[in-house]
């Protein structure tokens, strides 16, 4: 390869990480590259475990040994050679922080620029008068003096302040010794050494003013210089206060000037960056220390059901024989203050809620009630009662704003910083576009505002217009977190880097995909190499270069099936990706939709941005909840439906989101299951075969073998989790990890068992010539074939439990494969397989899936839909939150939310079948579904 070419490509030779089969390829630099292929084919092994791992390892190894000990240790990937690799940055689909101080604003650095902006051009307003707080300089006072015509009689005075322990007489003597000769007392000018003053001081408590200068206004330089000196002296003697008395038309007008930052008798703190930082003691609210929440009385525990009125026992702590007396007194006085005792709590105005909580002189409010319990908590019954209603609640001092009150006095265009960070990003972007500033403010803030607007634009372009900067990073979904990191990367303007992204389209509505593609192209155009592991059709078609890995998954994958541009991909015969893009393979639309009569209904859903909506979820069919990102899908399904059903059926669970009630045919369900993409186990000991309970039967089968029975081996001897049959040298791990302080840990195959995890005598037990280790090394497909034995009940049970793994498309994974190596999509399908192995339900379950197509290829989605249909055939019900049009078109019923995200969402746009939705012009989802649904039918 020529030197010129070597600089333009990343060359990989002999990559053998996980299932990669010694692959070699050249990846063009400064291009948008998509790596496609089935789930488990080796995409992440190439992108993250090979390219990113090597790029990061080389960077870390370039640092000193001292610096390396503080960084995560990265092992060298199993590859012969990689050349031409730039510094690598991985943006994965996971929430990287659970820090309660981390917000969207801080992670994107927009908040840092906002702090700087408020420190530079923010204006402080007095909370008492609402007037702007100003600090006068000497030149301000001189300009005021010079604003009068020549000859105007004026006088510069300074108030005389007595320090502790100083008498008026002592102060006058001190001023006299400094060279001052006159003071003003009750509008009379008197000499300091006159006897008259001493008499006045003994009689009157009148305030003294020191006469600094008397003059007639002139506009020559000498006069203005004299005034400046006098004003300087007045500020020094008057403790930062200066008075200019103007005599005009037989009137005396006094104007006060202060070089202190004060107004209405309050001295304010001058705006600075630290004042607006909730991570700094100078800016954080002293009560909650910048968290926005404190441990206190939780409103949600005091009023658990907000659909009830005070009369109907909405207040949980005012129930019971003795405590109901407080409720009776409140109701007795309610009429006097026009409090609506029959109105549901959630409909009460803020004024009425304050009355309930703070009470009045006529009755005790909830706050006083809990203060009383606090005083009596030395008694066990009061202590127990108080603990029932304690939880994390909004800080009463800063009201969740995180900053001390002084920071809220500073405004830009009538907006405080906490008000700005609470706005959705779309409205915040609009605010900065319409910002009206003075010429001076514009010059000072031009660069800061440019940086803010650029970063806000990137967030809008990745489909996050509905988020606010105050949103906690820990509450974001994996897709949202990834797109925020992507926007932050664009804002940093890095060049010459390798960006590796894991399915950035997760959680993104088809409407916003083209915006994401533009962001990826912008990142490329800055001079970066952008590698995206992706299944989205539109993103694949937009790539400069496509690498398709396959042909299938697991041991049947790990090969480069195709490498080239989009046009060349259409002619790739072995590529499943090509077949689906060319419509040679496709996911068929169901010929009929399932009818439903039973349902679960949520009434008055108000959580987050939901607009008090009523929703019916049909049972015994496949229901898909769709809508723009941020339209309220998760709030409705995961925030209200799931916890409400869990609490109703089991009596426990997280607090459901705000709603009136949940009704319908709940009695027809035995349980509710949330099937998410969280790992099924994080330890190296956890594996799919133990999760689906097939390993219990395999161990039992080996314990039944003659050699095992002769030696008294029980099923526990074939477990690598407990002592008995496992190798004690490696404790059943098969490997021994040697910790290296400055380098990556070295993993060595256990010399005692040669990586086979069990003792030699246990490995002597064979079934059909294979040991327990040999069985764990088999794939699901191989194991099903191996255990075909019609005469054995145990092998029948094993096959029954393994078959669902094959049905959900996981036939390629090894039985003993560590769960920590499974992708999110694979973990979700393992969970699905566990339910599929159960026989037809006597009392069916409701299964809830949140974007089950994450990480799935078209071919994987086809198998997933077959599994869904199998669940439905067994009498279960499905509710799916999804953006993928292949799943939406195969649904029986769709609940479309919107019309947009954030504050413009939270409504039900449409409910009905896919065909009806595709014809509904008001739905954004419907417009995209129309082309998918009817173009596919035309092809048929």
Residue ranges with predicted function:
Residues 1-940:
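Conserved phosphate-binding elements of NTP-dependent enzyme cores
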């Amino acid at each position: 390869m020529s030197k010129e070419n070597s600089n333009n490509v990343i060359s990989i030779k002999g990559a053998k990480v996980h299932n990669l089969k010694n692959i070699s390829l050249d990846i063009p630099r400064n291009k948008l590259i998509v790596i496609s292929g089935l789930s488990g084919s080796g995409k992440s092994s190439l992108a993250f475990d090979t390219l990113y791992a090597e790029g990061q390892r080389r960077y870390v190894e370039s640092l000193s040994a001292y610096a390396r000990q503080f960084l995560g240790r990265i092992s060298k990937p199993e590859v012969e050679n990689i050349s031409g690799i730039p510094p690598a940055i991985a943006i994965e689909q996971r929430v990287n922080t659970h820090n309660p101080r981390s917000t969207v604003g801080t992670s994107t650095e927009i908040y840092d620029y906002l702090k700087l902006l408020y420190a530079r051009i923010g204006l402080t307003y007095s909370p008492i008068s609402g007037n702007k707080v100003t600090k006068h300089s000497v030149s301000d006072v001189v300009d005021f003096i010079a604003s009068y015509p020549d000859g105007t009689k004026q006088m510069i005075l300074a108030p005389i302040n007595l320090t502790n322990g100083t008498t008026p007489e002592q102060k006058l003597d001190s001023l006299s010794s400094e060279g001052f000769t006159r003071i003003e007392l009750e509008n009379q000018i008197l000499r300091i050494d006159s006897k008259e003053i001493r008499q006045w001081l003994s009689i009157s408590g009148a305030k003294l003013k020191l006469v600094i200068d008397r003059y007639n206004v002139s506009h020559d330089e000498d006069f203005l210089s004299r005034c400046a000196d006098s004003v300087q002296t007045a500020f020094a003697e008057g403790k930062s206060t200066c008075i200019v008395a103007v005599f005009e038309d037989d009137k005396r007008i006094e104007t006060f000037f202060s070089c202190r930052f004060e107004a209405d008798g309050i001295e304010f703190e001058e705006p600075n960056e630290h004042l607006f930082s909730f991570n700094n003691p100078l800016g954080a609210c002293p009560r909650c220390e910048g968290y926005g929440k404190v441990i206190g009385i939780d409103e949600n525990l005091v009023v658990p059901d907000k659909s009830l009125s005070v009369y109907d026992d909405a207040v949980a702590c005012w129930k019971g024989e003795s405590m109901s007396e407080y409720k009776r007194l409140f109701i007795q006085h309610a009429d006097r203050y026009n409090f609506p005792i029959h109105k549901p709590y959630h409909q009460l105005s803020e004024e009425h809620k304050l009355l309930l909580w703070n009470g009045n002189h006529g009755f005790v409010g909830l706050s006083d009630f809990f203060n009383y319990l606090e005083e009596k908590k030395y008694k066990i019954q009061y202590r127990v009662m108080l603990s029932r209603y304690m939880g994390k609640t909004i800080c009463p001092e800063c009201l969740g704003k995180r900053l001390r009150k002084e920071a809220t006095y500073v405004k830009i265009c009538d907006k405080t910083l906490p008000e700005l960070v609470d706005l959705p990003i779309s409205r915040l972007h609009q605010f900065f576009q319409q910002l009206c500033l003075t010429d001076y403010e514009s010059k000072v803030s031009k660069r800061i505002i440019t940086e803010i607007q650029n970063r806000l634009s990137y967030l809008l372009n990745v489909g996050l217009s509905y988020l606010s900067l105050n949103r906690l990073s820990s509450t974001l979904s994996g897709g949202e977190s990834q797109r925020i990191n992507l926007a932050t990367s664009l804002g940093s303007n890095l060049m010459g880097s390798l960006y590796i992204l894991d399915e950035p389209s997760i959680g993104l509505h088809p409407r916003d995909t083209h915006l994401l593609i533009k962001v990826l192209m912008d990142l490329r155009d800055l001079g970066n190499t952008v590698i995206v592991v992706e299944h989205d059709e539109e993103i694949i078609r937009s790539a400069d270069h496509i690498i398709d890995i396959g042909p299938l998954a697991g041991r049947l994958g790990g090969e480069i099936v195709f490498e080239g541009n989009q046009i060349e991909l259409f002619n790739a015969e072995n590529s499943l990706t090509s077949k689906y893009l060319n419509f040679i393979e496709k996911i068929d639309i169901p010929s009929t939709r399932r009818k439903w009569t039973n349902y679960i209904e949520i009434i008055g859903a108000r959580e987050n941005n939901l607009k008090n909506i009523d929703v019916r979820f049909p049972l015994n069919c496949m229901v898909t909840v769709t809508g723009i990102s941020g339209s309220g899908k998760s709030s409705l399904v995961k925030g209200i439906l799931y916890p409400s059903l869990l609490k109703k059926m089991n009596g426990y669970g997280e607090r459901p989101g705000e709603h009136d009630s949940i009704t319908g045919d709940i009695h027809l369900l035995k349980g509710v299951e949330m099937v998410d993409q969280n790992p099924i186990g994080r330890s190296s000991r956890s594996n799919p075969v133990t999760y689906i309970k097939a390993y219990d039967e395999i161990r039992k089968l080996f314990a039944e073998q003659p050699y095992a029975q002769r030696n008294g081996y029980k099923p526990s001897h074939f477990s690598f989790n407990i002592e008995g049959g496992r190798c004690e040298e490696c404790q059943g791990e098969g490997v021994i990890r040697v910790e290296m302080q400055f380098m990556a840990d070295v993993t060595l195959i256990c010399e005692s068992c040669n990586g086979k995890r069990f003792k030699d005598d246990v490995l002597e037990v064979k079934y059909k010539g294979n040991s327990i280790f040999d069985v764990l090394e088999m794939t699901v497909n191989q194991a099903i074939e191996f255990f075909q034995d019609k005469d054995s009940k145990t092998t029948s049970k094993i096959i029954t439990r393994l078959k669902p793994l094959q049905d959900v498309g996981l036939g390629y994974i090894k039985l003993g494969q560590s769960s920590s190596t499974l992708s999110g999509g694979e973990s979700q399908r393992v969970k699905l397989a566990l339910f599929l192995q159960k026989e037809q339900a006597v009392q069916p379950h409701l299964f809830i899936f949140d974007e089950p197509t994450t990480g799935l290829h078209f071919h994987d989605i086809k198998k997933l839909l077959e599994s869904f249909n199998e669940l439905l055939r067994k009498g279960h019900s499905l509710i799916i939150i999804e953006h993928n049009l292949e799943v939406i078109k195969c649904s029986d019923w769709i609940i479309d939310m919107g019309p947009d995200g954030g504050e413009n969402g939270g409504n039900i746009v449409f409910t009905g079948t896919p065909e009806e939705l595709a014809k509904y012009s008001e739905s954004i989802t419907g417009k995209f579904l129309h082309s998918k649904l009817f173009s596919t039918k035309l092809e048929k």
